[in-house]
Amino acid sequence: MGKNTKPDVSQIAFITNQKTLIAACDYLQPPDLNGDPDKCPASLHARYSRIKLILTDFERNPSVFLTYNLDPSEIRLLHEKIGMLTMTERNFDWSTTKDFSSFGNNRVEVFRITRMPMRNNQKAKYPWAISIRAGTSENGKFKAEQEVRKFLSDDEIQKFFIDIVAYLNVWEMTHGAPFIRNVIEPYKAERRKGIQEKSRKAAEPPTSDDFEIYDFD
């Protein structure tokens, strides 16, 4: 860990030196057993299930500490893209923004991850950069107030995201198994029962009760 930081038992992965630190922490939440209108009913995550990324700049006084929450699907997306780009000379630029205006706040946070494998016609030792910027929105324009950036090598960023995804897989198996067993499978069993009942009735020969009898006298 970096200086002036306390151990966090929810910490999944971290990379640090004397200047900066990047860490990932478990802010995951299991699915709501009663369902969530904003998520697929069979999703293994609650609406606000997240991986919290932390960036700290120790060189400033006081140190700058910024965080950004990523959806598990965003973590997996980045993991896949990083794996495909490593050992190539391709550039990469991905970002996501959170606007808190709907909460009556003009705060804006921006997470960005870039790759620039060549600098000044030479292979970069640390081609990746992960940054978090925090600021405000004024008249539709973003005004940055704080920023922390961490440079990483191909190996460092791969190990970082591999550790996160490995943890994510175990977490989903741990919480997903009882959810599937206690919620999804009973629902499917009831659905099968209903389908079988309809099929059984459709296969039965008609009886006199199925016909209307008219008296023409």
Residue positions per predicted region:
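Mixed-charge, glycine-accented linear interaction segment located at domain edges/termini
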Residues: R133-D217
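Intrinsically disordered, low-complexity regions
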Residues: V9-I12, E89-T97, R107-F111, S208-I213
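Short, low-complexity cationic-aromatic patches
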Residues: A42-R47, Y68-P72, R119-K123, R149-Q158
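Beta-strand-rich binding-surface signature
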Residues: R50, T67, P127-A129
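N-terminal, helix-rich and Lys/Arg-enriched segments in bacterial and organellar proteins
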Residues: K19-D32, P62, P72-H79, E109-M116, ...
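N-terminal "first-domain core" detector
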Residues: M1-S63
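Short, solvent-exposed interaction modules
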Residues: E80-M84, T88, T97-F151
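Compact, well-ordered interaction domains used in eukaryotic information-processing assemblies
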Residues: P37-L44, I54-F100
